[in-house]
Amino acid sequence: MGNYLSVNDTDRKLMLEKIGTSDLMELYRDVPADLILKEPLSLPEGKAEMQVRKFMRQLSAENKVYPVIFRGAGAYRHYIPAIVDQVASKETFLTAYTPYQPEISQGILQSIFEYQTMICELTGMDVSNATVYDGATAAAEAAAMCRDRRRNTVLVSEAVNPETIEVVKTYCWAAGTKVVMVPASAGVTDIGALRDLINAETAAVLIQNPNYFGCLEHAEEIVEVTHGAKAKVIMSVDPIAAAILKTPREYGADIAVGEGQPLGMPLSYGGPYLGFMAATKEMMRKLPGRIVGETTDDRGNKAYVLTLQAREQHIRREKASSNICSNEALCALRAAVYMAAMGRNGMREAASQCVSKAHYLQKQLEEAGFTRKYEGEFFHEFVTDSPYPAAQVNAVLDKHDILGGLELPDGSILWCVTECNTKEEIDRMVSILKEELA
């Protein structure tokens, strides 16, 4: 069995001479000294491929794969039609990067264009980009789109996913943009607090609908208050919920963002996912990343091109609207195939099942002594107060290979149901809780 031959000292010397230096550390001169490794990493001796494969199998076997899941909080188990994997695994698509001459790859560009078209239909917006890294990144990029010299403050609802909030804060910190949190009350954004906090320096207000607690926001009222202060509304949405709810544009949002993982991406231990972004025509030139457009070639045939490239880093460098470079085209392809395979009726059916099954679980949990924490409408997630410690509830379910809801900081539990959960699974879980926690 062959061995991997790494770069040796002679190779390093030749490469350094080629670029005109003899000191490897010269290449790291811009890296702060305290971040540079002082000694080589202490690594074990190399192993043969067969030994490595055996070790990796043993390591992966330590993961617990749950056949039944009642947890969401940003990553959701939805059914993925077989055609999604079949198309995405084709060697013509299965690549990490768009070719350097993208117009040569009309198939890839067409798939991205169709993805953009369907995202616009789903959100009601005028234009979509070719995705960013994930939903949190999309929200942060949207915040960056809205700021200008006069307006450099972003208001973020406390009902937004906490991980999204952290990413937005990081982006805004680097850009010198101020982030102000808007309190949540009764599981939704506090409109009164929003009125008190918004001012002439506010660039945008970020909300999530349905929000982190599963509740539907009073979106129209939030939009009215925000636009009254001449600020922009960024609405983070669940793409499955968007199939049956009003679109962000119908609510009056200026930018729609969200986590695209439910659109054909497996949970996959957190990634790769995709962040979708769509906006009104007025915001189009501030959208980050690639945008594919449709045109005609010199023979009059339909053709696809990368358009509005003056926004991108390979044209404007440090003045670009974004520095997204690693391509999410494969994830966008999966999302496009998923939406095309499901169709309008299929996505509405999946969303409707999410709603009905989640409400069924809520009623069953109430019979088991759990109480819903927040009133109002919800999609497929909701929060309950538990008569037992949340950790104990999940420990009991774990023994039966069921992943329970997410324990929140106040001890309540955030539950999630999708079309993949059956009535039998719900009844079994509730029965286990009644029997073993009584």
Give the positions of each predicted feature.
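Gly-rich Lys/Arg/Thr-decorated short loops/hinges at beta-loop-alpha junctions or inter-strand turns
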Residues: 91-102, 118-124, 150-151, 172-180, ...
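Active-site C-terminal subdomain of aminotransferase-like
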Residues: 263-368, 372-375
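Short loop-beta-helix segment that forms the pyridoxal 5′-phosphate
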Residues: 100-104, 120-140
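Conserved PLP-enzyme active-site core in the AAT-like
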Residues: 15, 137-300, 368-369, 373, ...
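N-terminal entrance/gating region of PLP-dependent enzymes' catalytic architecture
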Residues: 36-113
